[in-house]
Amino acid sequence: MTTTDTTIQHRTAEPPTPQQKRTTFIALMIVFLLSALDMTIISTAMPRIVADLHGLEIYAWVTTVYLLTSTVMVPIWGKLGDMYGRKLILILGISIFVGGSWLCGLAGEFGDLPILGSGMIQLIVFRGIQGIGGGALFTSAFATIADLFEPRERAKYAGLFGAVFGLASVLGPVIGGFFTDHGTVEIFGT
């Protein structure tokens, strides 16, 4: 059995200034908020989505597949972040997340597709893609906090992430309900 060295190779550059730390933290909170909103916004939109895409018997998978794929990807994204850097993984995660959101908005627009089937199956597959990106967002955010701040400061910043998630839990269903009144596609940003 071999062990791997998971220590992060820091560049010889100067450590980030307090202003750079604040800016980075605010950007991470925005990313975290969008990912957390995505988990909660869909709950109030599901009745409309099911009516549009006709998949009552499998509607629970729309939420489940996102949570499943994002959770499974956490250790993978974490290791990749250790190997290739947090910024690269965060940008890759944002790209996958946004691409998955765009695809979710298109689910069912082209009828039954040979590999992806009906609109509801398409939505489930695309939510899985979105979850893969979402896992990178959560992982990169918490790992970057560990990189930026001393151990005694980390709990405070992790707690602020918890507050952002609480805010998303309250705002998500409200925003989802608002967008549902204007059509289901808008919750995915298309």
Segments from the language model and where they lie:
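Transmembrane-helix bundle of Major Facilitator Superfamily
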Residues: 2, 8-190
